[in-house]
Amino acid sequence: VLCPGLQIDFVDEKKSEKVKWLYEDGLNSYLIESSSDIDLLIDESIICSKSTDTQEVEFAINWSKNIRKDLLNETYVNLIPTPQGGSHFNGFKSGLLDALKEFCEYRNLLPKGLKLVADDIVSNSIFVVSSKLQNPQFAGQTKERLDSKDHMSFVSSVTKDTLSIW
């Protein structure tokens, strides 16, 4: 998933079964496969990949037209799953919120008194966020949550810019 073009072949000799995993386009291929039974809001998922000398973020996102609890929501840091999210996920949500707020305010789409919050935007979304950075700081030994504050602003900025252009 996080290494586009990498093929993994698993052979279960006891059951004489073979399974092949290959995501030619990385996150996009994974998102398409994972959402094959979902009625998506937009035809093509929003895909982004941005890197600097010290950090990188890649994400793919789409939304389900129907309320579902079983949607793919995954985050990674340096190929390590981060089920509790952390600063990269918070930056992603912040960027989504900023872009949507900007869009709605510019077009006067928000009713007076209605306040958007990030959780509303991601609540029915299907996404994968993958970050790579030097010397990541994790909260705890299990590496379930990233705690690198500088990376949050990078991810937020990249996410907002990507959605603003989209």
Residue ranges with predicted function:
Residues 150-166:
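Flexible helix-coil linker/hinge segments at domain or subdomain boundaries
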Residues 15, 148-149:
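Long, charged, helix-prone linker segments
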Residues 2-143:
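GHKL/Histidine-kinase-like ATPase module
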